[in-house]
A protein has these predicted regions:
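Catalytic cores of large soluble enzymes that bind and process phosphate-bearing ligands
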Residues: 15, 19, 123, 187, ...
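Long, contiguous hydrophobic alpha-helical segments, chiefly transmembrane helices and signal peptides
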Residues: 27, 187, 248-251
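Short, basic, helix/turn surface patches
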Residues: 126-138, 172-178, 231-250
Length: 278
């Protein structure tokens, strides 16, 4: 997937040298293994302002230069109503990383808070819908998000503990509400600690929670649960060193005749359906 060895800046050089094994190689592995990109794709790389999406943007910038097939990229910052301080930080980092992003202003923070005060779920849903709408209007057929390996295993365990379901965060999925649009997660194999290391190596400062309604109470219910599960995984690792790998692998290692039931296209199937046929 590479053809040009030259570098545009120090960030590209670090991606290809110091962080080649932990960022670049795993980025390319995820794209190849899950077939996330095809010739002629127009990718909307979504930038929230945090470390993950900024790292994703720089990886895509490097990939666009080194790929052996043509595809287009649009870098998008969907501004849901950031305060000036946060927006200025995003702009500063975009300039530092040489990411030519388009910033599209919306009023999602205000609208979501007016409808259901402090509703992170509603805000996230509205932001996702806005991303699809904006990306489609720009001619994109895929949107890329900065979820990583640790997000995947945390989400998998959260679903089991909080909702009694066995679901994971997929590397790609078709949009049910926006025909022809697809969501991809190219950093599926990248560990959060390596993104943090990359940011520290370059002395970069990124947004944490940028919601102006939770700045004084950043630990919302969902954020609190996610933090708890991440700590739980950390603690489990002390006794089970392979626990992260095992959680990640579990959704890819399901034996259907050893589970009570599953859903397929919304229809429930029980192990009893064919139990007496044997």
């Amino acid at each position: 997937m590479e053809k040009d060895r030259s570098f545009t800046d120090e960030f590209e050089k670090a991606i290809s040298t110091k962080y080649r094994l932990y960022l670049w190689s795993r980025f390319v592995k995820g794209i190849k293994e899950y077939k996330l990109l095809s010739p002629g794709d127009h990718i909307c790389v979504c930038i929230s302002g945090g470390k993950d999406s900024m790292c994703l943007a720089k990886l895509f910038s490097f990939l666009h230069k080194h790929s052996d097939f043509d595809f287009d990229i649009t870098y998008l910052v969907m501004d849901p109503g950031y305060n000036k301080k946060n927006l200025d930080l995003i702009k500063k980092n975009l300039k530092t990383l040489r990411i030519p992003a388009k910033i599209v202003k919306t009023d999602i923070f205000d609208i979501a808070n007016a409808q259901t005060k402090g509703s992170c779920f509603l805000c996230a849903k509205m932001r996702r819908g806005a991303l699809y709408n904006i990306a489609k209007s720009m001619g994109c057929n895929k949107i890329a998000l900065g979820h990583h390996y640790d997000d995947v295993i945390t989400t998998t365990l959260m679903n089991m503990l909080s909702s009694g379901s066995f679901q994971t965060m997929l590397p790609k999925l078709h949009s049910s509400n926006y025909p022809g649009m697809e969501l991809i997660r190219p950093m599926y194999y990248i560990r959060e600690k390596d993104i943090i290391s990359w940011a520290k190596y370059h002395n970069l400062e990124f947004l944490q929670c940028a919601c102006k309604f939770t700045e004084e109470e950043a630990d919302t219910q969902n954020a609190g649960r996610r933090k708890f599960v991440k700590q739980l995984i950390y603690d489990l690792k002390k006794e089970i060193p392979q626990v992260e790998k095992n959680i990640f692998k579990a959704p890819d290692n399901v034996t259907l005749d050893m589970i009570l039931g599953y859903k397929d296209n919304g229809e429930y199937h029980s192990f009893l359906d064919n139990y007496d046929e044997e």
